[in-house]
Each structure stands twice: as C-alpha cells, then as structure tokens.
Regions:
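Glycine-rich phosphate-binding loops of nucleotide-dependent enzymes
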Residues: 1-136
C-alpha cells in the first residue's frame, strides 16, 4: 500500500511532532532536531526489516528524544531489527537489548543491556573490562 508522498510526509510530521510551517517546507529550513526527526521518520516509513540509526536523538530535546525512543521501540515490537550506533550510554541502555562494544576497532564485548551498567561498559570501552562473548 503506497501512500502519496505528501500524505506520507504529513503523517511523519504529525507522528514525530516536527515543528514546520508545512510539509512543503524544505528540510534545509528546519532546525537540526526537526531534521533528525524527519530522517528517522523517513526510514521507518519504508517499513524496513532492519533499521540502522546513528545517534538517533543527538540534538533533540527530552520530549523529542522520547518520541524517537517510543518510535524505535514500536519498530522492535513489530519485529524490526534496530541497530543503533552511538556513544551516549544512557541512550544505548534505553534503546538496546544487546550492546556490542568496540575498542581499537575490535569487539571487546557483547553485553545484555538490561543486566549491565555504565561502569561495565566504560571498562569494556577502555579495554580494561572482562571480555564477554555473544552467547552470554
């Protein structure tokens, strides 16, 4: 079911509470936070099986951040694999089920987000933590 581009744009604007004079306003005239919301909404609108987002709430106020959190969590509930790249541990712990930590270009651990702490992640990030395997 393909929607008309204008209708789809309006749905994204409404759902993500994008502050804009109208859907025909060029993205270049929007604030950074509103551009971020449009980018996430556009990707979700394509109904992907896998969704990769990098720094999905960077530059957003707390209300907009929670709008994005809820949207990404809804995608996970629909069975979409959501891969999130980031460095803000609070965001990663909020959005992720599992966290893969890199140090020096190598995997230093894969941990369950619900049972880890920022301190443990920090140790893995610096190479000081105990290596965790993917099957744990």
């Amino acid at each position: 079911d393909r929607k008309a581009p204008k209708q789809l744009a309006q749905e994204i604007v409404d759902k993500l509470e994008v502050v804009t004079p109208g859907v025909e306003t060029p993205v270049s005239r929007l604030s950074g936070g509103n551009v971020q919301k449009i980018l996430v909404g556009r990707e979700i609108a394509s109904n992907p099986n896998v969704l990769m987002v990098a720094y999905p709430v960077r530059g957003l106020d707390i209300n907009s951040s929670y709008t994005i959190y809820n949207l990404l969590n809804d995608q996970k509930k629909k069975g979409v694999a959501v891969i999130c790249v980031g460095e803000d541990l609070d965001v990663l712990l909020e959005l992720c089920d599992r966290i893969l930590v890199l140090n020096g270009g190598r995997v230093s651990g894969i941990v369950d987000a619900r049972s880890t702490t920022k301190e443990k992640l920090g140790l893995l990030m610096t190479g000081s933590g105990e290596e965790k395997q993917a099957n744990e």
